């Protein structure tokens, strides 16, 4: 029986099994981004004012800079993937980190970036998710993959901030897979 299943695997492509692997529909991606936004908010809520400016070592970003880096990338990837213009006030957040030194200002800037991506996904034309675009004038990928790369990026950098919280004696939020 197992041999029969294994023998038929080459006859089935991943696209046949799950077409969303190559061209995800915006709806499931919206749910993931809403969950990621809520999870990131938990990290921001866990941080104290001291944590926002904290750098575990002098040569890496502070907690606040990590969060602003996420926000900048959310805007850049979201804009490239959707064609939606980045709001004028949203460019170069990380370079303007001093303006976001308070928990309230930082949280608003980061949450606004998630709202931008979520809105871009909700407004996305499903038929265009498979279109090829160029990110950073360098990487060619589909619109759907650009949204996926943005998701991967924000997950990576949010995960990096776990150690910032732990080094300040704060228990980070529990994993939020669902």
Each model region followed by its residue ranges:
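Acidic/histidine-rich alpha-helical segments that form the ligand environment
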Residues: 32, 98-134, 142-153
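Short, contiguous alpha-helical
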Residues: 30-34, 41, 51-94, 134-178
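Solvent-exposed, charged/polar functional surfaces in cytosolic regulatory/catalytic domains
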Residues: 39-42, 46, 112-120, 160
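Short, solvent-exposed, charged loop/turn and helix-capping segments
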Residues: 47-50, 122-124
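Feature for soluble, non-membrane regions of globular proteins
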Residues: 17, 119-123, 175-178
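Short N-terminal segments immediately surrounding and downstream of signal-peptide cleavage
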Residues: 16-38
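Acidic/histidine-rich, surface-exposed loop or edge segments in extracytoplasmic proteins
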Residues: 16-24, 84-99
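Bacterial Sec-dependent signal peptides at the C-terminal "C-region" and cleavage site
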Residues: 3-21
């Amino acid at each position: 029986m197992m041999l029969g299943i294994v023998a038929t695997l080459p006859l089935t492509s991943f696209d046949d099994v799950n077409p969303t692997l190559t061209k995800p529909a915006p709806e499931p991606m919206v749910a993931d981004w809403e969950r990621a936004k809520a999870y990131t908010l938990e990290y921001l809520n866990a941080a104290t004012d001291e944590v926002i400016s904290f750098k575990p070592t002098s040569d890496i970003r502070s907690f606040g800079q990590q969060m602003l880096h996420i926000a900048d990338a959310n805007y850049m990837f979201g804009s490239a993937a959707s064609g939606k213009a980045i709001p004028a006030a949203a460019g170069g957040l990380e370079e303007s980190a001093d303006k976001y030194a308070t928990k309230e200002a930082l949280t608003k800037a980061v949450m606004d970036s998630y709202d931008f991506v979520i809105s871009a996904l909700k407004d996305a034309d499903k038929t265009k998710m498979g279109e090829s675009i160029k990110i950073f004038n360098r990487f060619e990928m589909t619109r759907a993959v650009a949204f996926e790369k943005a998701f991967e990026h924000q997950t990576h950098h949010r995960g990096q901030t776990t150690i910032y919280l732990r080094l300040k004696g704060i228990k980070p939020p529990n994993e939020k897979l669902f």
